[in-house]
Amino acid sequence: YLTIVPLFHCNGWTHTWMVPAVAGVVICCRDVTARNVYHAISVDGATHFGGAPIVLNTIIAAKEDDRLPFDHTVQVFTAGAPPPAATLAKIEPLGFNVTQVYGLTEVYGPATECAWQDDLWGETEQAERAAIKARTGVAMPVLEEATVLDENMDPVPWDGESTGEIMMRGNGVMKGYYNLPEATASAASAGDTLRSTSASGSRRL
């Protein structure tokens, strides 16, 4: 696992202990450049990393001298913003499979993801492929539930258009903000569900 996300992020510092726990290897990258990323993949054998879309664009824009060959598909978690269709169209042929994830510190980092179904979407055109990969609503195992509720706390329709507040519940959801009871109260609903007040979403099947 190539560490690109800073270690003070949940995604960064959890991987530093989780990867060795399953007999994996952590490769540290102090200076995130295309040359260093390609070196970690080609020479050190990195198979996974996480990074914002800007990191993907750095790889795409690499000078020819900075590119090194590799013979495996690199799995990439990206977050912060959906990867643009143009970015996906350029980086996937280079040997990178991009998965969009969503999360925040209050839920211990990434909590939902786009669960790609190749049997359904494997032959889709690039524009539709990018739109599907921008979805990120499938709860990861640490999350009991992820849903989208309207202002009345009712689930929004599964139409992909109606928007509401993202709500999450599970073992990884924070108990509260330290010494900030008012902030905790505003972020919690029914005591055990986190209101993602900074983000809205929609639902579709």
Feature map (PLM): residue ranges:
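Residue-level signal for inorganic ion chemistry
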Residues: I41, F49-A52, T197, L205
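Conserved AMP-binding/adenylation subdomain of ANL enzymes
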Residues: F8-T47, A62, E145
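Gly/Ser/Thr-rich phosphate-binding loop
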Residues: A21, V43-G51, I60-A131, E144-E145, ...
